[in-house]
Amino acid sequence: MIKSFLLLFLFFIASSASAQKSTAWYHHTLLDVQNLESSVAFYTQVFQADTIPYPFPPSPQYIVKWLKVGEGVELHLSQWVNNNNKVIRDLPSEPGHLGLVHLGFMVMSMDSFLTRLMEVSTDYKSGKYKQPIIDRMPYGAKTIEIKDPDGNEIHVIEAMPKKRSTNR
């Protein structure tokens, strides 16, 4: 009994220690699609994703729908069209190939993340990629765009502190 309790106790300590180690987590994927309406229908029906508000001003050429898939994970679907509502952005012609635009991650501290990026990324240390410039999302969160060693875009957003309730 004591041995079982001790093993259970050690498991919880190890779990909480590993949970505290990561300061970044997966946030969203942006996919370019050929038909936004059918893609939204697919993800909302098959995966029971919920639509969420798009926080930027609308554009007639760039049509976007944001979906919440599970807890804290988003799928952003986009479609580029011309004035005649025809898709203008070339997508991979191979069926089943993702139209991946960028990966999105959230971090606890943008400053700490940038320091780590500049310290550990050979491409940023060597000057292959310039240090990213911090921008802000419409709701105020710090954001940057970086690239991985293959040149894939990664969108990094600093987590906003949760508002404290004044009701007691």
What function would you assign to each model-found segment?
Residues Q34-S38, N82-D150:
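Vicinal oxygen chelate
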Residues S18-S38, L100-L103, I157-R168:
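N-terminal beta-strand motif that seeds the catalytic metal site of vicinal oxygen chelate
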Residues M1-F5, Q20:
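Positively charged n-region of N-terminal signal peptides that target proteins for export
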Residues P58-Q61, N84, M160-K163:
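Flexible, glycine-rich phosphate/dinucleotide-binding loops
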Residues S4-I13:
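Sec-dependent N-terminal signal peptides
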